[in-house]
Amino acid sequence: EPKKSSVDDLFAKLRQAGAENVASSVKTVKDSSHKTTETPKKAVEPPKPIEPDLKMFERRDSALIAVDEMLVKKLKRVLADEENAMLNYLQSKKAQVALEKVLPSFENQLQTFVEATSKELIEAAMSGAQSLSKSLKSDLRKKISNATVMQVLSKKLADDIVYPLRERIQKCVESSDGSASEMSSLIRSTYREWKMKQVDKIVGDISRLAYSRGAYLVLETGVKVCWMVDPNGPPCADAEDNSLAGEVNCGEKFPTGDEHPVIHAGCKCLVVPSSR
């Protein structure tokens, strides 16, 4: 009888342990079930580009009409003078001619373009400044100086005109094999293309850069600014990236590494204060 009692006790303990395990399992399942029904966190919405202010773009385009017309005339005048100087030089030469004898130095050539266009480019920059500031013109002019504007525009003139033009003239020299008459013919063709086509293509980019530069210069450092894409401009992934960046402190750069437009050929974007 004692043996039977001990066996009964053993089974009783096992049944008790089994019941406790089942209860524990049920509790675990309930806890797990409870956790899965928690309200999921809301997904973070991707940033959206700021709404374009069409009036700001229209004001810019209107302000640059007269500037562009004068820039075209002055740039073509410089190109014509360069061409004539080269052709006159070549007419007096019978022997082979090298590039350095035909073209002025890079620095002198760039300086000629800078001096010819600085008046109109400063005017464009002032228009940009006045689009964001109501200060007196005399006060704005302290910020919109030849140095602050032309240090940026000089590089633009070099990249858009001087470098590519010199490259074309280099090819003229190489293709002519030193023949002055052949070189003259190729140079005429090159300058004709620049005066008839290229100048009109690039002048808008140059004046819009001056306008944006002027607007940027009157903003106080640290002011929150946004990159605004012109819906009438060409599609550009870089511009979209800058726009999606949202607010940036003035003085800091947008994702593309630029402080303000223009960042590519045909760029029509603007940088504007967030609290405009």
Predicted regions and their residues:
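N-terminal leader/targeting and assembly helices and adjacent pre-domain segments
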Residues: 2-200, 204-214, 274-276
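Acidic, glycine-rich two-metal-ion catalytic cores of nucleic acid-processing enzymes
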Residues: 193-276
